Regions:
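Secreted/periplasmic proteins
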Residues: 1-111
């Protein structure tokens, strides 16, 4: 691990779990490019988040039902929407909030 990678790991270790509202991507975005350059795939476990660096793996827990999923941050959110994460369709389905559209979540950086 080089110095830059070590600094990133040290920075990520400083993130305490945080809470907020999560939404999920519209199916209309399937195949469109994300901030990381990869194409959005609703079947992958990915997320958009403005708080954490691209490539960060996080555990997202639906606080209403206790279900959790691990996702990789590969995109950014519009700053106007007031959410902490926008999850892929598959991740939202696993967490059980597709019908509701939004849910309160706990986000933890995986070390």
């Amino acid at each position: 691990m080089d110095t830059k990678d070590a600094a990133i790991v040290a920075e990520l270790n400083n993130y305490a779990p945080f809470f907020g509202t999560a939404s999920y991507y519209s199916s209309k975005l399937q195949g469109r490019p994300t901030a990381s350059g990869e194409r959005y795939d609703r079947e992958k476990f990915t997320a958009a988040c403005n708080i954490l660096p691209l490539g960060t793996v996080i555990r997202v827990t639906n606080v209403r039902n206790g279900k959790s999923v691990r996702v990789r941050v590969n995109d950014r959110l519009s700053k106007k929407i007031g959410r902490i994460a926008d999850l892929s369709g598959r991740a939202a389905s696993t967490l059980g909030y597709v019908k509701a559209g939004l849910t309160r979540v706990k986000v933890e950086v995986m070390k």
